[in-house]
Every structure is written in structure tokens, then in C-alpha cells.
Amino acid sequence: MTTYLSQDRLRNKENDTMTYQHSKMYQSRTFLLFSALLLVAGQASAAVGSADAPAPYRVSSDCMVCHGMTGRDTLYPIVPRLAGQHKSYMEAQLKAYKDHSRADQNGEIYMWPVAQALDSAKITALADYFNAQKPPMQSSGIKHAGAKEGKAIFNQGVTNEQIPACMECHGSDGQGAGPFPRLAGQRYGYIIQQLTYFHNGTRVNTLMNQIAKNITVAQMKDVAAYLSSL
């Protein structure tokens, strides 16, 4: 009986030792991985302001996390595609995030801190970079229900509900111009989110607040279905 207990204690001690060693190894690997990530992030951030760095590496690592290297493919449905977006529009939005005049929820959480680190030169460089990227090519066909109805709203508006045609500012093909953003191929969820913000006044823009105040949720989805399919 005594021998059995001793062996049992010995096994427990060996297990405790192995668990401790495994824990130390895990902590060590975690520390090394974290250190490596910090190093890579630091190198990427250092490259942002370097005129000698290849163009993609001038993009802040903060931008790449959500918008991707080229701004074509985003990780989240409410994160906008930036590839091919108009320079003046992007500059205006980054400045609005920086001075907190664009104050929607995601802007406050994610974009305010990022924009605070950008001076005028970096804002211009980022706008130039993403503007120069080729917009994504959408596959043919309707990805979301309501695209047909959305096309009618976009091109003709809804006169009896005092909703003007979107194409008057954003162009017949949704390409936009100057201060009016490109909407063709934009993310479905992002369009709905921003129309909601304009509708309820969360995102302040005198023109869009007036236009979106009468639009229904169903109409938002239809317009988003059409634009995201372009």
C-alpha cells in the first residue's frame, strides 16, 4: 500500500513537472510570437513615411488590418472598399475622422485613433495610393435580392416620397466624382450602415441627411443590393 502511494505521488509530481514545463514553453512561444508581431508592425509603420519604400508598404499596418493591402477586399462587411475611391473624398473623410466631425460608432472606435496619427502629407499619400488601386471586378448576376428595385431608386428616385435619384451626384454607373464617392462595387453591409447613419443623423452631411431622411430600410437594402452588384 505504501509503495503504491509513493508511486502515485511520483506520477503526480512528474505530471506537475510536465505541466509546468509545457506552460513555460507556451508562455515563451507566446512571448516570441508577440514580439515578432510587434517587430513586423513596427517595421510596417516605419515604412509608411519612407519615400524609398515600395508604394504598398507606405500604407499603414493599421489600414491593412481592415481594408487589405490594396483596398479591394475587406475582412468585414461594414468595412468599405477603398480601391479606386476618389482622392478628394478620401482626404475629406480622413480629415473628418481626425477632427472628429465624422462621429459614427465605428469611426469613433477604429478610425479616430488611426486618423490622429496622420498629418496632411500622410492623408494625401494614403488617398493617392488607394485612388490608384484598381477597383474589384464584380461577377455578373445579383448577389442580394432587390437589386432591380434598387436600380430604379438609384436612377430615378422615388418622387412621391421625396427621394431624389442617387445618380444625380454619384453618376449613372455609381462611379461618383470628386467629393461624391464611388459606390459601384461597394460592400452591401457598409452601404446599408451608412444610409442608416445619414437617415438618423449619426453621420452629419447636410445633403445626404436631407436625401436619406425619407428612405425606408427596405429601400436601403434594395439600393445596396444594386450598387454592390456593379
Curated annotation (Swiss-Prot):
Heme c 1 binds at residues 63, 66-67. Keywords: Electron transport, Heme, Iron, Metal-binding, Periplasm, Signal, Transport. InterPro entries: Cyt_c-like_dom (IPR009056), Cyt_c-like_dom_sf (IPR036909), Cytochrome_c4-like (IPR024167), Cytochrome_c_Oxidase_Subunit (IPR050597). GO terms for cellular component: periplasmic space. SUPFAM superfamilies: Cytochrome c (SSF46626). GO terms for molecular function: electron transfer activity; heme binding; iron ion binding. Binds 2 heme c groups covalently per subunit. It is found in: Periplasm. Diheme, high potential cytochrome c. This is Cytochrome c-552.
